[in-house]
Regions:
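Intrinsic-disorder-associated, low-complexity terminal segments enriched in Asp/Asn/His/Tyr and depleted
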Residues: 3-6, 12
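A domain-level signal for the structural core that forms small-molecule/cofactor-binding pockets
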Residues: 11-201
Length: 201
């Protein structure tokens, strides 16, 4: 059993976004809000937002593939606390949190950075948490592993800043392969919650 805790964020950029068009649209939005886009403090905002969106929505341009693997005999691999940021597709407000990811290799393991980039591929776009969790699990499982578990915990600003204005967090989970079995599912959940239960390699 292998256990990793991962907190580094890897930055990529959306290369196909029309920067000038985005700046124009943001300027028009500022006017519609009732503000002056030429005043100090706002004059460079369209450019800043266009630049930020290239990074925030880089998942659409991701060609990240889980093709690089290494021979390794391990029952399960657990990667904890993968930080992610995404944008709710309903209100275009952020939701963010951490993902716990586990998989059972079939004789080969993936590089840790590849799995982090897989999370970024599906989080850096207009999303809902439920679909993001499913997307990550499905792609990882499609690469020949015996089982996958993905648990995402997130704060949603669309719920905190508007509407019910509640600070509740949201947890979603997806299980594939052997981890769909009740006993295996319960076991991997306990390992994710309590890494001390891992056997020493």
């Amino acid at each position: 059993m292998v256990n990793y805790k991962y907190s580094k964020l890897v930055f990529d950029y959306c290369i196909y976004m029309d920067n000038e068009r985005v700046k124009k649209l943001i300027r028009e939005l500022i006017i519609e809000i009732g503000e002056d886009p030429t005043r100090e403090g706002l004059s460079n905002t369209p450019e800043r937002i266009a630049s930020a969106y290239k990074e925030i929505f880089s998942g659409y341009d991701s060609n990240s593939e889980l093709s690089v693997q290494f021979s390794e005999d391990s029952e399960s691999v657990v990667i904890r606390d993968i930080q992610f940021y995404s944008m709710c597709e309903h209100h275009m407000l952020p939701f963010f949190g951490k993902i716990q990811l586990a998989y059972s290799p079939n004789g080969r393991v993936f590089g840790i950075s590849k799995l982090v980039r897989l999370v970024e591929k599906y989080s850096r776009r207009l999303q809902i948490q439920e679909r993001m969790t499913k997307n990550i699990a499905d792609e990882l499982f499609s690469n020949g592993v015996k089982g996958v578990a993905v648990i995402a915990q997130a704060e949603h600003l669309c719920m905190k800043m508007r509407g019910v204005r509640n600070n509740a967090n949201v947890t979603t989970a997806a299980f594939r392969g052997i981890f769909e079995k009740k006993e295996e599912k319960e076991n991997i959940i306990q390992i994710i919650k309590n890494p001390s239960k891992l056997s020493t390699l």
